[in-house]
């Protein structure tokens, strides 16, 4: 095996998906603790104080104590290199969160054991399904009251349409939480409270049918054995092929706050989740062990560093090897550049990078020329697919406070749209500017960045738009006829693409029925 192939085999690139407050920030900290990337985990409560959680950037995040921006953390674990892509976890996350899922090879789904499957989890799973991403599941908060575990597994299967295969099973919960039983390994991992902030070796009891296990479970022993028989009879067994194809998820139980069960999940990512996979481009499929470098940009982040008013383009490496000072081609602009200063991330601590391999995420300094979806190669003209725009779910009309600044407004919005901070639509019938977003917070972010970076103040007004659909049609005459009839609701987006802004769900359904030859798409590929 060549050095490059060995490096690729060591890589695991994944993201965490969860509903706000399911415990994602805490589990991120504990994963970093496992990888010895941080010496001691700060509890979530300290997030709003001076000790920001390691993945909180930008002024507004500091004020709100939330992580708006998707950051990347790399750490070693069991002779593997883990790339963890953090996704904004609060109620108002953005399209960035969806796009981050296009840059990973697997995902970790964190569920609150007291609440089960929640709306954001469903939305994120829909995005994972676009690429059949393998999912590992962690049912969190066992140190509190949780719902019946069998009921939780049924809900995962019914709502998320994926088979659930429990690997560990909880012994009690809240004050009676005694640990988890490993279903295939036949051993108990004992839970001892109070070790949330450090790395500790958990005590193991071999064999459920042992005096030690009986003593540990006490009064719970008989009912637990009975429950296990039911579980083993009713639940799916783990199957590697079904997992890799995104049809089955292994399920683990634990408490991230108590730092218990998190290592089981990380072991599953190392043992079962795929190494970096081949990536489809318009021209061909690119394999990770190919010698030549390729990569694509899935996110652009502004002002990570308040001292430097720069923007960083996050690039997922698909093949080859990045070396400091190498030359690469920016395919869309057909321009060669020498990259001497790519960054690797341990959250906000930026470090200069000497080399990186397929599966790794690197940061390129961007002075406004790089866009989301851009491909970089060592010369070959390639364009990777599968980095879409997602139809916004919320819309606002922009009103400028100073009418003389309309040029700055357009310039600012164009740039923010290229970064993926928002989507911009220019209606065919008016001079309005409409912004689209996936989460309410994106509007606040855009307004504060327009003010700080472009010295433009704007306000928002409500507008009757339910959703946007990108329009295409193979029949030019039909398209022209549609454009004439639907002019009222048509707009051009920031990339120059024809878009239908549907005022209601019913309206969209009617239009799709009335115009069968017109394609109304909920996603649009970049470029």
Curated annotation (Swiss-Prot):
Annotated localization: Cytoplasm
Pfam short name (any one): GTP_EFTU
GO molecular function: GTP binding; GTPase activity; guanosine tetraphosphate binding; translation release factor activity, codon nonspecific; translation release factor activity, codon specific
Chief location: cytoplasm
GO BP, sorted A to Z: regulation of translational termination
HAMAP family reported in the protein's UniProt record: Rel_fac_3 (MF_00072)
Identification of the protein by name: Peptide chain release factor 3
The encoding gene: prfC
């Amino acid at each position: 095996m060549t050095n490059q192939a060995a490096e690729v085999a060591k890589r695991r690139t994944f993201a965490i998906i969860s509903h706000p407050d399911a415990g994602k920030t805490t589990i991120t900290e504990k994963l970093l603790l496992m990888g010895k990337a941080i010496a001691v985990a700060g509890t979530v409560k300290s997030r709003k104080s001076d000790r920001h959680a390691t993945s909180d950037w930008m002024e507004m995040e500091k004020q709100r104590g939330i992580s708006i921006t998707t950051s990347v953390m790399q750490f070693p674990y069991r002779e593997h290199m883990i790339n963890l892509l953090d996704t904004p976890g609060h109620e108002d996350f953005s399209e960035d969160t969806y796009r981050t899922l296009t840059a990973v090879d697997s995902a970790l789904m964190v569920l609150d054991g007291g609440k089960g499957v929640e709306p954001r989890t469903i939305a994120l799973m829909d995005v994972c399904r676009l690429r059949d991403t393998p999912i590992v599941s962690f049912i969190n908060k066992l140190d509190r009251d949780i719902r019946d575990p069998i009921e939780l597994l049924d809900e995962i299967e019914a709502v998320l349409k994926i088979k659930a295969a429990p690997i560990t099973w909880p012994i009690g919960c809240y004050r009676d939480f005694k640990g988890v039983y490993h279903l295939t390994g036949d051993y108990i991992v004992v839970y001892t409270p109070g070790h949330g902030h450090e790395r500790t070796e958990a005590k193991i009891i071999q064999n459920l049918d042992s005096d030690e296990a009986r003593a540990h479970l006490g009064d719970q022993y008989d009912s637990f054995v009975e429950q296990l028989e039911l579980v083993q009879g009713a639940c799916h067994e783990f199957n590697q092929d079904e997992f890799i194809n995104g049809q089955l998820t292994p399920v683990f139980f634990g408490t991230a706050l108590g730092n218990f069960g998190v290592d089981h999940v990380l072991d599953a990512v190392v043992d079962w989740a795929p190494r970096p996979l081949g990536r489809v481009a318009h021209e061909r499929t690119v394999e990770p062990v190919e010698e030549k470098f390729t990569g694509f940009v899935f996110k652009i982040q502004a002002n990570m560093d308040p001292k430097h008013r720069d923007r960083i383009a996050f690039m997922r490496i698909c093949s080859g090897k990045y070396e400091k000072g190498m030359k690469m081609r920016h395919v869309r602009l057909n321009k060669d550049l020498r990259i001497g200063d790519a960054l690797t991330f341990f959250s906000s601590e930026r470090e200069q990078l000497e080399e990186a391999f397929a599966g790794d995420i690197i940061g390129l300094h961007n002075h406004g020329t790089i866009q989301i979806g851009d491909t970089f190669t060592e010369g070959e003209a390639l364009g990777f697919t599968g980095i879409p725009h997602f139809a916004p779910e919320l819309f606002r009309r922009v009103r400028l406070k100073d009418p003389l600044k309309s040029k700055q407004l357009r310039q600012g919005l164009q740039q923010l749209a290229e970064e993926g901070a928002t989507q911009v639509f220019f209606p065919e019938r008016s001079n309005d500017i409409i912004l689209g977003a996936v989460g309410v917070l994106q509007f606040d972010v855009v307004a504060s960045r327009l003010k700080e970076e472009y010295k433009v103040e704007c306000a928002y007004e409500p507008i009757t738009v339910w959703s946007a659909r990108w329009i295409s049609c193979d029949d030019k005459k039909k398209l022209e006829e549609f454009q004439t009839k639907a002019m009222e609701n048509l707009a051009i987006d920031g990339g120059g693409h024809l878009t239908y802004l549907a005022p209601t769900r019913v309206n969209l359904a009617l239009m799709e029925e009335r115009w069968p030859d017109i394609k109304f798409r909920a996603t649009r590929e970049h470029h």
